[in-house]
């Protein structure tokens, strides 16, 4: 039966290529697929779903890390700490909306001084005229 299948032990073994490397991603596609199946989100999980989810998660992580790195550099630091992540997320409109109800541990609060508490600007002739009327 020549030409039927491969003989056992013949030829070089093929090196396994991960689905992450096939998709050009750093996040683990296989692990995400396993979590999707184990989580019972659906009875069946398509082949492209874990790849797409891994790509989305990788993009979000890269976006947050880039903004947090900028916040760390603005504060003259070389290490990203939770405070930098908090500043990055809350200063970005879309990320702030996405993570609106999320508490970042050790993130602190956003610096904010109410306008009424700020000192009044000198030389405001309109403000003086308004006070004279009342």
Curated annotation (Swiss-Prot):
Keyword Nucleus found: yes
Main location: nucleus
Subcellular location: Nucleus; Chromosome
Top-rank taxon, per record: Eukaryota
GO MF entries: DNA binding; protein heterodimerization activity; structural constituent of chromatin
Record's keyword terms, sorted: Chromosome, DNA-binding, Nucleosome core, Nucleus
GO biological process: heterochromatin formation
Gene3D superfamilies registered for this protein in UniProt: Histone, subunit A
Tissue note: Expressed in meristematic and non-proliferating tissues.
UniProt keyword Nucleus present: yes
Annotated Gene Ontology cellular component terms: nucleosome; nucleus
Pfam families referenced in this protein's UniProt entry, alphabetically: Histone (PF00125), Histone_H2A_C (PF16211)
Assembly mode: The nucleosome is a histone octamer containing two molecules each of H2A, H2B, H3 and H4 assembled in one H3-H4 heterotetramer and two H2A-H2B heterodimers. The octamer wraps approximately 147 bp of DNA.
Family to which this protein belongs: Belongs to the histone H2A family.
Function: Core component of nucleosome. Nucleosomes wrap and compact DNA into chromatin, limiting DNA accessibility to the cellular machineries which require DNA as a template. Histones thereby play a central role in transcription regulation, DNA repair, DNA replication and chromosomal stability. DNA accessibility is regulated via a complex set of post-translational modifications of histones, also called histone code, and nucleosome remodeling.
Name used for this protein in its record: Protein H2A.7
Taxonomic lineage from the root: Eukaryota, Viridiplantae, Streptophyta, Embryophyta, Tracheophyta
């Amino acid at each position: 039966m020549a030409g039927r299948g491969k003989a056992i032990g013949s030829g070089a073994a093929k090196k396994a290529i991960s689905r992450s490397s096939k998709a050009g991603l750093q996040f683990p596609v296989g692990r995400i697929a396993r979590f999707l199946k184990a989580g019972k989100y659906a009875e069946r999980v398509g082949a492209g779903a874990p790849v797409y989810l891994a790509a989305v998660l990788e993009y979000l992580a890269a976006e947050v890390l880039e903004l947090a790195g900028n916040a760390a550099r603005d504060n003259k630091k070389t290490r990203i700490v939770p405070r930098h992540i908090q500043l990055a997320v809350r200063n970005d409109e879309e990320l702030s909306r996405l993570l609106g109800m999320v508490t970042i541990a050790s993130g602190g609060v956003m610096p904010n001084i109410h306008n009424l508490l700020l000192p009044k600007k000198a030389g405001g002739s309109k403000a003086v005229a308004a006070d004279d009327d009342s």
